[in-house]
Amino acid sequence: MEEVWLMVSPLNPLKTGAQLSPDAERLEMARLAAAGLPDVHVSDFEMHLPRPSYTWRTLRALRAAHPDMEFSLIVGADNWLVFDRWQHPEEILAHHRLLVYPRPGFQVDESALPDGVVYVHAPLLPFSSTQVREAVRRGEDISEMVPPAILERCVARYKLPTE
């Protein structure tokens, strides 16, 4: 894999009632998180597509916009376990390699993965974005959960405590 594109998605259709920050704020947070990672690029590509946002539509648009590139999709184990509920999962699998990243509490049977789907043996991240958002809503210290640039932004915006 030459580089990773972080697609900031307007809304996950499977997460009804989710409270999201405005698109511009989420995009800026992603850019802060990726700062200093030379092979990670934050993209607003998906924000310019029709809503609701569906992965098959995004991947189809990426293939059309960049016909010389090959795209893989990285999803968490939690999303892989509901992948059959996504719109057009067969189209995604027909055109893209799918990498499943481990998530605490979600077990994936590697022997049952279809062709083109690879379970990535990688370190578990200690916190999910949901846990960070919940801590921010409760006004808790998130200094152990996020990079310094994100912490600085959240402390200023949400008046959070620091160590």
Descriptions of predicted regions:
Residues 1-163:
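Nucleotidyltransferase catalytic core that binds NTPs
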